[in-house]
From Swiss-Prot:
Domain N-acetyltransferase intervals: 11-156
Species whose genome carries this gene: Bacillus subtilis (strain 168)
Gene3D superfamilies: 3.40.630.30
PROSITE patterns: GNAT
UniProt entry tagged with the keyword Acyltransferase: yes
Name of this protein: Uncharacterized N-acetyltransferase YycN
Name of the gene: yycN
This protein's UniProt keywords: Acyltransferase, Transferase
E.C. no: 2.3.1.-
Family: Belongs to the acetyltransferase family.
């Protein structure tokens, strides 16, 4: 089966936001950038700031990743500023729900994104990946992404 990018609907967005807010908070704690007691509130604020109008926030594109009309296997969110000098879009969030991982769907989704991005006039895709997420890093490298900046921290 082939992954389809379909514009996220309101109910899908609500479910996505609940899931991803929690997951992002956990990842920030795991990365050591947020304290556990602050993480949920900070995560909610990040998403409120980035998507003040939800699905209607200009230049943000949120898709459900589907195998067919009803089976949602994941999500993908990009920001594509039309006036960006490099015609670049930033992947804010991308993921598959646990039962669908390791089946090749992530590569299919990124290939579908490449095609959609080209049709939007985008010439470059960028993203952030947590250093501890070796699976994601490997996926991105296998699909043509390269490191451009590295941020490092040291606990004292």
């Amino acid at each position: 089966m082939t992954i389809m990018l379909t514009p996220m609907q309101t109910e899908e967005f609500r479910s996505y936001l609940t899931y991803t807010t929690k997951h992002y908070a956990e990842e920030k704690v795991k990365a050591g950038t947020w304290l556990p007691e602050d993480a949920q509130l900070l995560s909610k604020q990040v998403f409120t700031d980035l998507l003040p109008r939800g699905l209607e926030t200009p230049h943000h594109h949120l898709w459900s990743l589907k195998l067919n009309e009803k089976d949602i296997v994941g999500w993908l969110w990009i920001h594509a500023e039309p006036e960006h000098p490099q015609q670049e879009a930033f992947i804010y969030d991308f993921g598959l729900y646990e039962p669908y991982r390791g089946k090749g769907y992530a590569k299919q989704a990124l290939a579908a994104l490449d095609q959609a991005a080209r049709s939007m006039g985008i010439r470059k895709l960028s993203l952030h990946v947590f250093a501890h997420n070796q699976t994601a890093r490997k996926l991105y490298e296998q699909t043509g992404f390269q490191e451009t900046d590295v941020v490092m921290s040291k606990k004292l």
